Amino acid sequence: MADPKYADLPGIARNEPDVYETSDLPEDDQAEFDAEELSSTSVEHIIVNPNAAYDKFKDKRVGTKGLDFSDRIGKTKRTGYESGDYEMLGEGLGVKETPQQKYQRLLHEVQELTTEVEKIKTTVKESATEEKLTPVVLAKQLAALKQQLVASHLEKLLGPDAAINLADPDGALAKRLLLQLEATKSSKGSSGGKATAGAPPDSSLVTYELHSRPEQDKFSQAAKVAELEKRLTELEATVRCDQDAQNPLSAGLQGACLMETVELLQAKVSALDLAVLDQVEARLQSVLGKVNEIAKHKASVEDADTQNKVHQLYETIQRWSPVASTLPELVQRLVTIKQLHEQAMQFGQLLTHLDTTQQMMASSLKDNTALLTQVQTTMRENLATVEGNFASIDARMKRLGK
């Protein structure tokens, strides 16, 4: 029996099964929930494409030659993996930089310095204090230093005598080539053809390879032609006037191009000659007379047609007058005949239903007659069997009584 102190508490359901409710999901469904997306601007959402990453690092190997990740006791640092855009050596490694590594390091440092100077130029305000290097002057010096670095890189590729202006590298290379040719000609003239057959070839000779790209030339030529056609189309669209349907002078002046429009205008202007105008005026006078005759004939024809239609309408009304008097009686008779037709249709449906019912009853009687005949035959057979059984029982009783 329950404790009586809980008998009169509010909110207790009596004579009902106990139900324990909770807002939590079952244990099997607790892990299945949608992750709450972070909408903060401080969180950077990075979309990673696994297929692209796999294609980028496919068939790549990590070189472990010269690497040492073991612990150390001395002051010498061990060589581990180095990562970055450029391979730059740290201090104290005891490894000498190659010229390529030194050039990349200097170029990277100049780029970092340029970025810092640009930040200073945007943030620092004008001040009255005098400085030795202002951000503007420092930026100019950095640009010159970067140009020198790039020029030194080109000198390493093209030779120590390469003096190329970065503003126009193609023109500078052409000038350099002409200077080399002039120097070669002067050296040949000074030698005077005294070289012997067994003498080695002159090492100061310069060999150039000219690479022509006809596809690039064709592409640039096609681009220029397309640009010219585009400008010509814009010019034609600007000069060409839109055709006005209300203006008879502008009819037929919508040419496909500017030349066609000019030819059409020239043909129209040539049609304004005095001799041509006299011929046109004579033709217009004859045409005007014919038009007036056609208008008069058309008016007479229209009047005759109107009179004919009026006579036909009057005859139709005369024929309709006796029919109109008998129309109400005809409508009443048609309504009565409609009701008779509906009753006849219902009677026909009843006859059809009665015929169908009679056929069903006849078929049922045939089935019942067949069943009755079968039952009578079965009863006769059963009665004969019962009589035979009683006769055999009487015979046995008589034998037993004797």
Swiss-Prot record:
Database matches in Pfam families: Dynamitin
Modified residues (Phosphothreonine): T134
Compartment(s) of residence: Cytoplasm, Cytoskeleton, Microtubule organizing center, Centrosome; Membrane
GO CC aspect terms: centrosome; cytoplasm; dynactin complex; dynein complex; growth cone; kinetochore; membrane; microtubule
Post-translational modification N-acetylalanine, affected residues: A2
GO MF terms, alphabetically ordered: identical protein binding; protein kinase binding; spectrin binding
GO biological process: melanosome transport; mitotic metaphase chromosome alignment; mitotic spindle organization; protein localization to centrosome
Signal sequence annotation: none
Modified residues (Phosphotyrosine): Y6, Y86
Ranges that cross the membrane: none
Keywords recorded for this protein, A-Z: Acetylation, Coiled coil, Cytoplasm, Cytoskeleton, Dynein, Membrane, Microtubule, Phosphoprotein
UniProt feature coiled coil, ranges: 99-132, 215-245
Region Disordered, annotated ranges: 1-27
Acidic residues bias: start-end ranges: 18-27
Phosphoserine modifications at: S83, S321
Membrane topology, as annotated: Peripheral membrane protein
UniProt keyword Cytoplasm, yes or no: yes
Source species, domain of life: Eukaryota
Function: Part of the dynactin complex that activates the molecular motor dynein for ultra-processive transport along microtubules. In the dynactin soulder domain, binds the ACTR1A filament and acts as a molecular ruler to determine the length. Modulates cytoplasmic dynein binding to an organelle, and plays a role in prometaphase chromosome alignment and spindle organization during mitosis. Involved in anchoring microtubules to centrosomes. May play a role in synapse formation during brain development.
Quaternary state and interactors: Subunit of dynactin, a multiprotein complex part of a tripartite complex with dynein and a adapter, such as BICDL1, BICD2 or HOOK3. The dynactin complex is built around ACTR1A/ACTB filament and consists of an actin-related filament composed of a shoulder domain, a pointed end and a barbed end. Its length is defined by its flexible shoulder domain. The soulder is composed of 2 DCTN1 subunits, 4 DCTN2 and 2 DCTN3. The 4 DCNT2 (via N-terminus) bind the ACTR1A filament and act as molecular rulers to determine the length.
Family membership noted in the UniProt record: Belongs to the dynactin subunit 2 family.
Name of this protein: Dynactin subunit 2
